[in-house]
Amino acid sequence: MVTVVDRVTSRRLRHPEKMHRPDTSIQKKPDWIRVKAPTSKIYKETYDIVRAHKLVTVCEEAGCPNVGECWSQRHASFMILGEICTRACAFCNVATGIPLAVDDNEPERVADAVAQMELKHVVITSVDRDDLADGGAQHFAKVIYAIRRKAPKTTIEVLTPDFRHKDGALEIVVAAKPDVFNHNLETVPSKYLKVRPGARYFHSIRLLQRVKELDPTIFTKSGIMVGLGEERNEILQLMDDLRSADVDFMTIGQYLQPTRKHHPVIRFFPPEEFESFAKIGKVKGFLHMASNPLTRSSHHAGDDFAILQKARDEKFALQR
């Protein structure tokens, strides 16, 4: 059977690689997942700044439930290197396909927006760019340098892909000295083949460990979603794996199914279970844990950075 698509009148399929998958039912969200629709004046101003600079945000592309709250506080996470990803993770709402050429003017536009919004802390992330020799590492570095020039008081957090098969890429990003280096594991290793087939769990662990080896002053961070069918003991083992890589900060949030073609939600974790993970994480030695149903990597990132700084200072004081 051949499907003919009218390229003039039809929108590009956002997830062509998922079209062969059977539809799955989307469960009704429990009350603790509900969020208010964005309505504030500041939300509109943030939206206008993003559009004026022709930028992409992961807040919109990934369908983040916290976009109303964050944008109303002038918090935005910029997604560089385009809006088309070369991978097809079963949980992700970012479009998959063949990316466009890298926009060489993007670093300056991002820096201009950061300065205009007077951000204290900014998160820079990207799609996977397996098509690029360095996976986009040099572009990450250019964005960091541009922000340092135009908004020197802003602290910078990067949320990077895994740079798999990209020798030297990680070193380029670390040399640009972001304040926080985040790379998400996303899920437990037993779910990788189905949920994150283009990645490798222990490669991601090693990536985070290598950041600390290259520059111990950079905070490291990683996060997962729960509700994909993982077992509790797998989550606890993952925490241990992150601590063995000297990761400072972990986030845990509830997976929410974007469309019927995406991986279904197997279970909604209640708030008290997230609280339990947060307590366990602190005992295991993380400087900070953010664990609740609506936690996302960039949610409250600025506040979390301040907590990280304080926790590290207190840890060093005890060691003297």
Curated annotation (Swiss-Prot):
The keyword Iron applies. It is an enzyme of class 2 (transferase). SMART domains: Elp3. Pathway: Protein modification; protein lipoylation via endogenous pathway; protein N(6)-(lipoyl)lysine from octanoyl-[acyl-carrier-protein]: step 2/2. Residues 71-287 form the Radical SAM core domain. It comes from the Bacteria. Its cofactor is [4Fe-4S] cluster. It catalyses: [[Fe-S] cluster scaffold protein carrying a second [4Fe-4S](2+) cluster] + N(6)-octanoyl-L-lysyl-[protein] + 2 oxidized [2Fe-2S]-[ferredoxin] + 2 S-adenosyl-L-methionine + 4 H(+) = [[Fe-S] cluster scaffold protein] + N(6)-[(R)-dihydrolipoyl]-L-lysyl-[protein] + 4 Fe(3+) + 2 hydrogen sulfide + 2 5'-deoxyadenosine + 2 L-methionine + 2 reduced [2Fe-2S]-[ferredoxin]. InterPro entries: Aldolase_TIM (IPR013785), Elp3/MiaA/NifB-like_rSAM (IPR006638), Lipoyl_synth (IPR003698), rSAM (IPR007197). Residues 1-26 are annotated as: Disordered. Keywords: 4Fe-4S, Cytoplasm, Iron, Iron-sulfur, Metal-binding, S-adenosyl-L-methionine, Transferase. Its EC number is 2.8.1.8. [4Fe-4S] cluster 1 binds at C59, C64, C70, S298. Its main location: cytoplasm. [4Fe-4S] cluster 2 binds at C85, C89, C92. NCBIfam families: lipA, PRK05481.1, PRK12928.1. This is Lipoyl synthase. The lineage of its organism: Bacteria, Pseudomonadati, Pseudomonadota, Alphaproteobacteria, Hyphomicrobiales.
